Amino acid sequence: MRLDSMQFVDPHLFLVDDTDPNNLMCTADITEALNGVLGDDIEKGNFNLLVRFEDYPAVQEIRLVDGDCEPPATAGAPWVCTPSDSSPAVLLGLEAVDDPLCRDIDPLVYAADSVPMLNDPGQPCMRTHRGAFSLAISGSVGALDLREAQFVASLDDAVAPTRLVSGLLYGFLPQVSAENLTFELPIYGPRSLWSVIDVPVCQDLYPTLLPSIDTLQIKDTLAPGVWLAINFTAERVVIQPAP
């Protein structure tokens, strides 16, 4: 399956006017602008993340891999994708989920206003073991180096699934990783991901969404960063082997 939608839900991202370093100004919530960039990348085939797995419910693991994909020639037909050899697949083992709902988040690490917007997958579903992995979310943004992360989604049918619905990717993104991710916003220009997350000047304007900075013990270090959550869906594609 190929991800056909993706939206940043938390943290919200804010643009700061730093023309005068002594007078920083909170300009705008640009979360939807970034989501527009993500959506354009997917729609145009510039970003193709494939979710590959065996027949449900016998599936034990999923593979997340970049693909080279072509849009369908006729409306309603599936995309045609070839798994890419340019980057290694992310192999994630699955854990059993007996509860009716499948995500396993701590809502207290997210903004209260964002929690109702997070996808809440139900059965039948797949949930990966919690762990550390690096996953590209866009050709424009790059790969997120996540800790304590999980990939969760419902299937539209337990026997012959054609879609992943109500998907949620969540985990902790360390500051050092977010600082190395740069994306281009229309009008606003290039920004590092961390520069639109760590925005204390915006807190008074958006008190129910900020602050979003947190910490996580990583080995012997209490690392600053942010807990993030991304909604997604995926659709079945035709897999074409590489020539």
Can you name each region flagged by the protein language model?
Residues 1-243:
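Extracytosolic secretory-pathway proteins
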